[in-house]
């Protein structure tokens, strides 16, 4: 990577552990990288921060946050829906806020998150973590599932 004082470039690389291995393969690149690793989300330790995050994005979109009990339920389901990945949780939240705005709602609801997840994954309602009761048993990485294909 070339560096030029009048045109500085900064890269943000996001990926799996294999990306870190690739960066470490090149000593020059490894010297120029500041790695920041985000741990996987936990339904125990990260519920409150995700509840705050969903409320933040709702307010940034000009909406009221969901009611506290519903917001906590949304956050728990969001951790599962995002496969415990923080960046994906943010993307789904933004999509849900956009869905609420598109429908003229005053605040995001679980239905908006369900629609955002369905649009992203293509899954049916019976496999949507924002709809079903036992959402924590779903393998959300299997996209475009249909009933009977589990």
Language-model segments: which ranges?
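C-terminal alpha-helical "lid" subdomain
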Residues: 43-45, 51-150
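The catalytic "switch" region of P-loop NTPases
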Residues: 1-69, 73
């Amino acid at each position: 990577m070339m560096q030029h004082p009048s045109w500085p470039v900064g890269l943000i690389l996001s990926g799996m552990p294999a990306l870190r291995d690739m960066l470490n393969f090149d000593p020059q690149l490894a010297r120029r990288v500041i790695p920041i690793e985000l741990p996987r989300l936990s339904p125990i330790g990260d519920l409150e921060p995700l509840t705050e995050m969903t409320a933040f994005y709702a307010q940034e979109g000009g909406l009221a946050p969901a009611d506290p009990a519903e917001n906590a339920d949304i956050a728990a389901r969001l951790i599962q829906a995002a496969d415990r990945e923080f960046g994906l949780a943010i993307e789904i939240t933004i999509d849900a806020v956009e869905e609420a705005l598109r429908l003229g709602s005053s605040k995001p609801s679980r239905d908006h998150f369900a629609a955002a997840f369905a649009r992203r994954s293509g899954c049916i309602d019976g496999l949507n973590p924002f709809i079903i009761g036992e959402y924590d048993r779903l393998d959300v990485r299997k996209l475009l599932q249909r009933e009977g294909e589990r």
